């Protein structure tokens, strides 16, 4: 289910890039809002959560919370290495794709 490859820095509107500064619940709430939408933004049917290095566990935690609360379903997990120009090494990256759970109702 997972693959390893070199990745670029492209990011789409339905993407959440997590960091170590916030907890997984914070990013799970953002994902829920992306599925719900608001006056300024239309809802998405798919959300992509990515994490680099030590933030991979935060990305996994956020996706797990969303799946446990029937907000989204994990449809794809991809691992890769991110090459940084600043440091001369490759950094592990995880990308988790969730689609809106069929039972999810925006409140």
Swiss-Prot record:
Chain positions with N6-acetyllysine modification: 23, 32
Organism: Plasmodium falciparum (isolate 3D7)
GO terms of molecular function: DNA binding; metal ion binding; nuclease activity; RNA binding
Keyword Cytoplasm attached: yes
Effect of residue 23 to R: Results in a significant loss of nuclease activity
Record note on modification: Acetylated. Exists in both acetylated and unacetylated forms but predominantly in an acetylated form. Deacetylated by Sir2A.
Impact reported for residue 57 to A: No effect on nuclease activity
pH dependence per the entry: Optimum pH is 7.5-9.0.
Temperature dependence: Active from 4 to 70 degrees Celsius.
Keywords: Acetylation, Chromosome, Cytoplasm, DNA-binding, Hydrolase, Metal-binding, Nuclease, Nucleus, RNA-binding, Telomere, Transcription, Transcription regulation
UniProt effect for mutating residue 89 to A: No effect on nuclease activity
InterPro entries the record matches: Alba-like_dom_sf, DNA/RNA-bd_Alba-like, UCP030333_Alba
Location within or outside the cell: Nucleus; Chromosome; Chromosome, Telomere; Cytoplasm
Cofactor: a divalent metal cation
Name of the protein in its database record: Endonuclease ALBA3
Activity regulation, per record: Mild acetylation lowers protein interaction with DNA and high acetylation abolishes DNA-binding activity. DNA binding and endonuclease activity is modulated via deacetylation of Lys-23 by Sir2A. Inhibited in the presence of EDTA and EGTA.
Entry EC number(s): 3.1.-.-
One GO cellular component term: cytoplasm
Family: Belongs to the histone-like Alba family.
Quaternary state and interactors: Homodimer. Interacts (acetylated and unacetylated) with Sir2A.
Effect of substituting residue 68 to A: No effect on nuclease activity
Consequence of substituting residue 41 to A: No effect on nuclease activity
Role played: Possesses DNA-binding and endonuclease activities. Binds DNA cooperatively in sequence-independent manner at the DNA minor groove. Exhibits apurinic/apyrimidinic site-driven endonuclease activity. Binds RNA; shows high affinity for poly(A) and a lower affinity for poly(U) templates. In vitro, prevents transcription after DNA binding. Associates with the telomeric region, the subtelomeric TARE6 repeat sequence and the var gene promoters.
Annotated consequence of substituting residue 32 to A: No effect on nuclease activity
């Amino acid at each position: 289910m997972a693959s390893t490859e070199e990745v670029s820095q492209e990011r789409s509107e339905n993407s959440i890039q997590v960091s170590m500064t916030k907890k997984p619940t914070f990013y799970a709430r953002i994902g829920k809002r992306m599925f719900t939408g608001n006056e300024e933004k239309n809802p998405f049917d798919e959300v992509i959560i990515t994490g680099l290095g030590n933030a991979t566990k935060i990305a996994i935690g956020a996706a797990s919370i969303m799946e446990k609360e029937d907000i989204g379903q994990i449809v794809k997990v991809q691992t890769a290495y991110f090459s940084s120009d600043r440091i001369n090494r490759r950094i592990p990256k995880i990308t988790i794709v969730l689609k809106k759970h069929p039972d999810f109702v925006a409140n």
